[in-house]
């Protein structure tokens, strides 16, 4: 009878009351229980008052109660009915799973989007490559055309230049004929001298006659000598005329670091140069400004105009045929 009464009394007591009574029998405080179970004092107080904290899951609360029961030597089997009431197990909320067809449809859409992106990228790259190739091909064709034109002009200049030696030869032949015919008047003097040898007076006459011929020969020689001496003096004048364009403020100086085709035209439309220049070549041109230049390889030439370098970097970066006009800058008054 006493055992049944004790069992009924234990069932009447709640889980929190039984744990508090057992703690008090062992002489433990709530602080001591909280330190041993590594819990907050407020959590121990809520368990003894049969409160379920809102921020604590029921699974953790059941675990704390079981640890508390083992600490105060209360059988867990006796607390199970009270645990079901105080901390009932709650069904976990599970998010509804997306169907496989939805994920497959989204994956298919992403695949189409990726394929379209790659297609656009390939089209852009292809158009860029085609544009570059067309420009490069057009430049090469233009350079080839200009080179062919310059070759034809050089051949025409060579054909027309063959008649020049004939003219100079005619001039030299005309210049030499007077020198060759000049001694001819001396022959009658010699013949007359040969016929008049028997008479002494003739000998005197011979002497008197020969002397003027010799004088004429001497004067011809002396007159020819200044002419011969004057011809070298004319050379510095011609050389000065050749060197004069270098001192011209409108002179155009070009140095070549590689083979390059170019064409230079002055303000009158005269072509100062049109053709191919080889590596390490120099070119000095003088004409009427402004100059119009067409250069096949801008990176292979360095240009100076009026003592200042000409900037060709914009043509070198784009790798294009350079077409530019050089205007004359006014020189400061002396």
UniProtKB/Swiss-Prot annotation:
Residues 161-175 have a biased composition (Polar residues). This is Cytoskeleton protein RodZ. Residues 30-49 bind DNA. The keyword Secreted does not apply. The helix-turn-helix (HTH) motif in the cytoplasmic domain of the N-terminus is involved in the formation of spirals to maintain the rigid rod shape. As this protein is anchored in the cytoplasmic membrane, the HTH motif may contribute to protein-protein interactions to form the RodZ helix, which is localized beneath the cytoplasmic membrane. The C-terminal domain may be critical for determination of the rod shape by probably interacting with enzymes required for synthesis of the peptidoglycan layer, including PBPs in the periplasm. Signal peptide: none annotated. Residues 1-111 are cytoplasmic. Its main location: membrane. Residues 176-211, 219-241 have a biased composition (Low complexity). Residues 133-334 are periplasmic. One of its GO terms (molecular function) is DNA binding. It comes from the Bacteria. Keywords: Cell inner membrane, Cell membrane, Cell shape, DNA-binding, Membrane, Signal-anchor, Transmembrane, Transmembrane helix. PANTHER family: CYTOSKELETON PROTEIN RODZ, PTHR34475. It is found in: Cell inner membrane. Pfam families: HTH_25 (PF13413), RodZ_C (PF13464). The chain crosses the membrane at residues 112-132. Residues 155-241 are annotated as: Disordered. GO terms for biological process: regulation of cell shape. Cytoskeletal protein that is involved in cell-shape control through regulation of the length of the long axis. Residues 19-71 form the HTH cro/C1-type domain. SMART domains: HTH_XRE (SM00530).
């Amino acid at each position: 009878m006493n055992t049944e009464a004790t069992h009924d009394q234990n069932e009447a007591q709640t889980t929190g009351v039984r744990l508090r009574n057992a703690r008090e029998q062992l002489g433990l405080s709530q602080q001591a229980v909280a330190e041993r179970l590594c819990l907050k004092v407020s959590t121990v107080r809520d368990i003894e008052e049969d409160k379920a904290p809102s921020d604590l899951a029921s699974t953790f609360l059941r675990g704390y109660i079981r640890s508390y029961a083992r600490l105060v030597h209360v059988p867990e089997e006796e607390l199970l009915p009270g645990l079901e009431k105080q901390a009932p197990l709650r069904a976990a909320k599970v998010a509804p799973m997306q169907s496989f067809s939805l994920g497959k449809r989204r994956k298919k859409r992403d695949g189409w989007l990726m394929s379209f992106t790659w297609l656009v990228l390939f089209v852009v790259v292809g158009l860029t490559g085609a544009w570059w190739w067309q420009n490069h091909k057009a430049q090469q064709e233009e350079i080839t055309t200009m080179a062919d034109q310059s070759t034809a002009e050089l051949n025409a200049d060579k054909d027309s230049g063959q008649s020049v030696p004939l003219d100079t030869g005619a001039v030299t032949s005309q210049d030499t004929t007077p020198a060759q015919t000049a001694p001819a008047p001396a022959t009658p003097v010699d013949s007359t001298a040969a016929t008049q040898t028997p008479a002494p007076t003739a000998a005197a006459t011979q002497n008197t006659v020969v002397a003027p011929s010799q004088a004429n020969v001497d004067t011809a020689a002396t007159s020819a000598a200044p002419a011969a001496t004057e011809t070298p003096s004319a050379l510095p004048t011609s050389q000065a005329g050749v060197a004069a364009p270098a001192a011209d403020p409108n002179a155009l100086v070009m140095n070549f670091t590689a083979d390059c085709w170019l064409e230079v035209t002055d303000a009158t439309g005269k072509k100062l140069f049109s053709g191919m220049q080889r590596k390490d070549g120099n070119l000095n041109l003088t004409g009427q400004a402004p100059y119009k230049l067409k250069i096949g390889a801008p990176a292979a030439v360095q240009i100076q105009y009026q003592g200042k370098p000409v900037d060709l970097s914009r043509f070198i970066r784009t790798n294009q045929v350079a077409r530019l006009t050089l205007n004359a800058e006014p020189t400061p008054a002396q």
